[in-house]
Design a protein with these regions (language model features):
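A conserved helix-loop-beta module that forms one wall/lid of the active-site cleft
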Residues: 1-41
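Hydrophobic alpha-helical hairpins/lids featuring a short glycine-rich hinge
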Residues: 86-145
């Protein structure tokens, strides 16, 4: 089963993983209440579909204007969004995620996946977040860092340190990263996921 971004973030929040403040828009009538509830300077508006590549396809908007939010919702609600990960028909947009825009210092990639070869959980990280990870793997494989969880589905401290070094994290960030990884692993194993990707982190 695939999850929408807003559903995944709800699960993240329940596992004490950091997420931006957000509201859901299912119809044009929801916009005013959503913007009032958020009360932020800048918004990220995202069409919800089970596919990547939304930004390049026009399915993501960065704006300070409630009127632009309204126009975006009129454009996409009830319509199909076509991205490089969908077929020619695209996927229907039944709701819009309205989020607080978060200041970006550095974009990272983090993923958990079942490795079929080793029959274990692999944790994949890269300092090149915000772009297609397959492109990074092809063009800059040295920027992809991969470790495996042990038989108890735990990550070893030396692997946390190795990933932190690869991501160029400082000591304070490494401490936060370690806690986040443990919570993310708990979510992955307890909900029996086959894939989690955070891009960008």
């Amino acid at each position: 089963m695939n999850l929408h971004e807003y559903q995944a973030k709800s699960l993240f929040k329940s596992y004490s993983l950091p997420v931006s403040k957000s509201e859901l828009i299912f119809s044009i009538d929801d916009i005013e209440q959503a913007t009032t509830n958020l009360k932020v300077k800048e918004y990220v508006v995202k069409a919800q579909v089970h596919a990547g590549g939304r930004g390049k396809a026009g399915g993501v908007l960065l704006t300070k204007s409630p009127e632009e939010i309204r126009e975006f919702c009129k454009k996409w609600l009830g319509k199909n969004l076509v991205t490089y990960q969908t077929d020619a028909k695209g996927q229907p947009v039944s709701c819009i995620l309205l989020e607080e825009c978060t200041d970006i210092e550095k974009e990272l990639y983090l993923g958990l996946v079942i490795d079929r070869t080793t029959r274990s959980i692999a944790l994949i990280a890269s300092p090149e977040g915000g772009v297609d990870i397959e492109t990074v793997a092809t063009n800059s494989p040295e920027k992809i860092f991969k470790v495996f969880l042990n038989s108890s589905n735990q990550i070893k401290e030396e692997d946390v340190d190795s990933l932190s070094m690869g991501l160029n994290l400082n000591n304070s960030q490494t401490s936060d990263f370690s806690l986040m990884l443990k919570n993310l692993i708990n979510l992955f194993t307890e909900k029996d996921f086959s894939l989690i990707e955070i891009n960008p982190l």
